[in-house]
């Protein structure tokens, strides 16, 4: 009976660590979701976003 108890405890510990590593997995809503466009202007506007305020890419040095 002692070996069975130890076996059950070890099995429970292994299952709990497996669930912790896997997490809850991908939900169907997450997989089918369309990624949002967080940069609608494209990469040029992403890197040159300093132009938006004054129209000058070198903002501190533009008169």
Swiss-Prot record:
Subcellular location per the Swiss-Prot or TrEMBL entry: Secreted
Tissue: Expressed by the venom duct.
GO terms for cellular component: extracellular region
Keywords: Amidation, D-amino acid, Disulfide bond, Hydroxylation, Ion channel impairing toxin, Neurotoxin, Secreted, Signal, Toxin
Residue numbers carrying 4-hydroxyproline: 57
Entry-annotated residues carrying D-tryptophan: 58
InterPro entries: Conotoxin, Contryphan_CS
Sequence segments annotated as region (Disordered): 22-47
Cleaved signal peptide residues: 1-23
Cysteines engaged in disulfide bonds, as pairs: 56-62
Single Gene Ontology MF annotation: ion channel inhibitor activity
Protein function: Its target is unknown, but this toxin may modulate voltage-activated calcium channels (Cav) or calcium-dependent potassium channels (KCa).
Domain notes: The cysteine framework is C-C.
Misc. remarks from the entry: Exists in two forms, due to cis-trans isomerization at 56-Cys-hydroxyPro-57. The cis conformation is the major form.
Family: Belongs to the O2 superfamily. Contryphan family.
Record-given protein name: Contryphan-Lt2
Lineage: Eukaryota, Metazoa, Spiralia, Lophotrochozoa, Mollusca
């Amino acid at each position: 009976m002692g070996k069975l108890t130890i076996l059950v405890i070890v099995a429970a510990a292994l299952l709990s660590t497996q669930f912790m590593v896997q997490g809850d997995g991908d939900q169907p809503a997450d997989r089918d979701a369309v990624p949002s466009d967080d940069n609608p202007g494209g990469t040029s506007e992403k890197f040159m976003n300093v132009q938006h305020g004054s129209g000058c890419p070198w903002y501190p040095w533009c008169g």
